[in-house]
Regions:
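HTH DNA-binding helix-turn interface
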Residues: 1-2
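Amphipathic alpha-helical packing segments from all-alpha helical-bundle domains
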Residues: 8, 32, 36-39, 45, ...
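Hydrophobic alpha-helical connector segments
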Residues: 8-36, 90
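Secondary-structure edge/capping motif, primarily at the C-terminal ends of alpha-helices
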Residues: 11-15, 41-52, 100-105
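Hydrophobic core segments within long, regular secondary-structure runs in both alpha-
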Residues: 23-27, 65, 69, 113-121
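A short structural micro-motif
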Residues: 32, 50-51, 93-96
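Hydrophobic/aromatic-rich alpha-helical bundle segments in the mid-to-C-terminal region
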Residues: 62, 75-123, 127-132
Length: 132
């Protein structure tokens, strides 16, 4: 579990808290995490999908769900999108980053990033209109 926690801590250390930094973060982090964590992700997935260790993996990811939801709650007032919408967007982003780090699948990464960009723009417009 330490390895998984370390990777997540590294990821959260560079996570933006300023909306102006989100675009840079989204562009850079998939490549950064592939270089820094690719081997660790592959090892972790091998270990935590084994029947012997699956419960440890489930427990870790329960905590991930809580931590990412808390991060989304901190972003909500800054970007004006409810945390209940931000949280699944974070999950999609992280999944795309992990997939890229493990397999260096540029097509998968870019298609996920494109839908995230469009989704965030649509949600931002929707919630700005609701506030007006």
């Amino acid at each position: 579990a330490y390895c998984m926690e370390k990777v997540e801590d590294d990821f959260m250390e560079v996570a933006p808290t300023d909306p102006k930094d989100v675009v840079r973060f989204v562009k850079e982090v998939p490549y950064w995490t592939a270089q820094k964590h690719g081997k660790k992700y592959r090892l972790m997935y091998q270990v935590y999908t084994l029947p012997k260790y699956i419960e440890h993996g489930k427990k870790f990811f329960e905590g991930v769900n809580e931590r990412y939801t808390e991060y989304a709650k901190r972003l909500e007032p800054k970007i004006g999108i409810p945390y209940t919408v931000i949280t699944p967007l974070i999950f999609i982003f992280v999944r795309a980053c992990v997939h890229y780090a493990m397999f260096e699948d540029e097509y998968y990464l870019q298609t996920q990033m494109e839908v995230l960009k469009q989704g965030v723009a649509l949600f931002a417009d929707k919630y700005k209109a609701n506030q007006a």
